Amino acid sequence: MAQQSLLDVQLVACSTFTTPSGVDWKVDSAATDSEALVEFAGRACYETFDKPNPRTAANDAYIRHIMEVGHMALLEHPTATVYIRGLSRSATHELVRHRHFSFSQLSQRFVHSDETHVVIPPLIDNDPQLRELFLSTVDEVRFAYSELMTALDNKLADEPNAILRRKQARQAARSILPNATESRIVVTGNFRAWRHFIGMRATEHADVEIRSLAVRCLEILKEKAPTVFSDFETSVLSDGSIMATSPYVTDY
């Protein structure tokens, strides 16, 4: 019986900052490590560690200023890594198009599960009849997958390497697995890349699944760098899903 998987995003790594020796600069106590790194990189460009401009002396004011003038390259220094579960293969295909990220994704060639875990689109999940049809179809595909695996195992019986035999069988049989099959993926990106991803995928024009992912990532990143992501505002759409937009993200 197919099992429903729900989106789960966890932060597993984020940049830390240590003031280098020999630099006479005091980190703003209100700044997070990632935000301190952004400011340090900017001040290193112009040797303004003495904070000559009172309007940008505070970390939050400094970061807002560089965003207003479009100096987004400074946001490429801090990075964040998340581990995502409960995301469909079709959604990961959209995710990996963001080439400034680094990815490590669950392999269907090496990992075999006795159960099928799927992500059900809300439009289907909210309708009992459609949900039943969806899950029964997934079960039929899973049965066909198991039959193919058995047949391929028999076909490859002369292969002495059991690991290779199973891998070859899986890589052939997996072609019939549904796009809704759950995947798991580690994603690392700098803050500029994360902002671009959120700007592109948290809009009302994006698919609801990847939009949910983008909004969840925004919530997580706001905790680590509130000023860097504070320009994004969320709102609720007519279908109850959440979107986010920023006046600084215009290249849709």
UniProtKB/Swiss-Prot annotation:
Protein name as annotated: Flavin-dependent thymidylate synthase
Function of the protein: Catalyzes the reductive methylation of 2'-deoxyuridine-5'-monophosphate (dUMP) to 2'-deoxythymidine-5'-monophosphate (dTMP) while utilizing 5,10-methylenetetrahydrofolate (mTHF) as the methyl donor, and NADPH and FADH(2) as the reductant.
Sequence positions that bind dUMP: 94-97, 105-109, 174, 201
Keyword Transferase: yes
UniProtKB keywords: FAD, Flavoprotein, Methyltransferase, NADP, Nucleotide biosynthesis, Transferase
GO molecular function: flavin adenine dinucleotide binding; NADPH binding; thymidylate synthase (FAD) activity; thymidylate synthase activity
InterPro entries: Thymidylate_synthase_ThyX, Thymidylate_synthase_ThyX_sf
Subunit structure, interactors included: Homotetramer.
Residue intervals of the ThyX domain: 7-235
Names of the cofactor(s): FAD
Pathway it works in: Pyrimidine metabolism; dTTP biosynthesis
UniProt-annotated binding residues for FAD: 97-99, 105, 190-192, 196
Reaction catalysis annotation: dUMP + (6R)-5,10-methylene-5,6,7,8-tetrahydrofolate + NADPH + H(+) = dTMP + (6S)-5,6,7,8-tetrahydrofolate + NADP(+)
Organism taxonomic ancestry: Bacteria, Bacillati, Actinomycetota, Actinomycetes, Mycobacteriales
Family annotation (Pfam families): Thy1
Gene Ontology BP term (one): dTMP biosynthetic process
Gene3D superfamilies (alphabetical): 3.30.1360.170, 3.30.70.3180
EC assignment: 2.1.1.148
Cited PROSITE patterns: THYX
The organism's place on the tree of life at top rank: Bacteria
Active-site annotation: 201
